[in-house]
Regions:
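N-terminal accessory scaffold of Fe(II)-dependent oxygenases
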Residues: 1-141, 149-179
Length: 179
């Protein structure tokens, strides 16, 4: 739902139920010209022969957790711009235990399982998975490989810059998902 940035911050700060996540902010990045800074400073992480760059800025209240999901992009980076976050990562071989849901309308690949508080009906399967737990602070960047499952838990006043890249060969490789 498109809303003003100041209103989004108010909603997040007053979010006592930890349910609001602000993401998919490409329009905001373009209107504020932050996108120029992202493009100028991503030379070290942008791959050669890139066909698509997707930048995003994520903010949420303390304790908010993103759904467990994976990306098909050739490269996925997250940069903590404020505060601290925690991540749970699982390798692609874990997919058979995660009841993956493929949403081709939004091009999202998620799991109904909450890796931070596993629901009882998924406990037996989730116990077969080994998750990598990572804590990150302001200024740290992390590369998340394609098809790796991840979920982010936001700390106090945390914000994240996200950089996602597709190359021409990556587009060919994921064409069965696109067509």
């Amino acid at each position: 739902i498109p809303i003003a940035y100041s209103n989004a911050l108010t909603i997040i700060n007053e979010d006592s139920e930890q349910k609001y996540l602000v993401e998919n902010n490409m329009e905001f990045l373009e209107e504020t010209s932050i996108i120029k800074s992202f493009k100028y400073n991503d030379n070290f992480i942008r791959p050669y022969m890139v066909s698509s760059c997707n930048y995003d800025f994520l903010i949420a209240n303390n304790g908010v957790q993103t759904p467990f999901k994976y990306e098909l992009n050739y490269r996925n980076y997250i940069l903590v711009t404020e505060g601290d976050i925690k991540l749970k990562l699982a390798p692609p071989k874990s997919s058979k235990y995660l009841y993956q849901e493929k949403d081709y309308d939004n091009f999202e690949f998620t799991s109904p399982i909450n890796p931070w508080d596993i629901q009882s009906q998924y406990k037996a399967d989730f116990d077969k998975i080994k998750c990598l737990n990572i804590s990150m602070k302001k200024g740290q960047i992390l590369f998340i490989p394609a098809y790796w499952w991840y979920s982010i838990e936001f700390g106090e006043n945390a914000s994240i810059a996200s950089f996602k890249y597709k190359t021409y060969m990556n587009m060919v490789a994921i064409s069965p998902h696109i067509i």
